[in-house]
Amino acid sequence: MHTAFSLTFLGLALGLASAEAISVTPHEQFSSSVGVLGCLINTNRVAYFPSSPSCDKPCVRLTDKEHGREVTVLHIDSSAGAHDISYDAWNYLKTGKSAKEDPQQGNGIDVEMEQITLDDSECKALLTGSNGKIPVMAKSPQWGMECPKDAVEFYNIGTSTCTTGTKEKCEVSGDKVDCPSGDAGASGQLEGMSVKNIEYGTGKEVDAQ
């Protein structure tokens, strides 16, 4: 009986140790310092945290125990110090509703943070247009090249907001990335794949810059 109790207590302690208490704040403008493409992910579920993005555990599960709400976000950009998340994700934690439906304003929300792997179904669900892999710009491949091959896909798209380029997959060849259209493929205007931001306080969708 004593051993069983000890093991149970140890399991609870390890579970608590894996979660970190933070305060999350709203972030309106989509961006990615590691070249992840907004048109191929759910940009309403992105994390902008002080730590560097990890391709081993790219997603973060945030739990607001006070209100019983939980949201999973994709960590693909760094911040100067704040734990920012997409405005829509923050609004959901605050109200249980999308920012498009019930836009709110405010400050930090206290949550518990747990990093999760790409194999997690909620993490994969955020990669809406890239077969469950992290979509990265071929012209800025440095971060993606450090990831396991089965974790990323490279595309010949010239900006993280998908304003230029060609929606074609590129292949890793040695220490570089080769695209069917070559480097020039990333420079032309890309139609129909614009990234939207949800405007803070109004809930209106606007084109990301």
Description of each model-found segment:
Residues 2-58, 71, 78-82, 87-209:
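Mature exported/compartmentalized surface modules and terminal targeting/interaction regions
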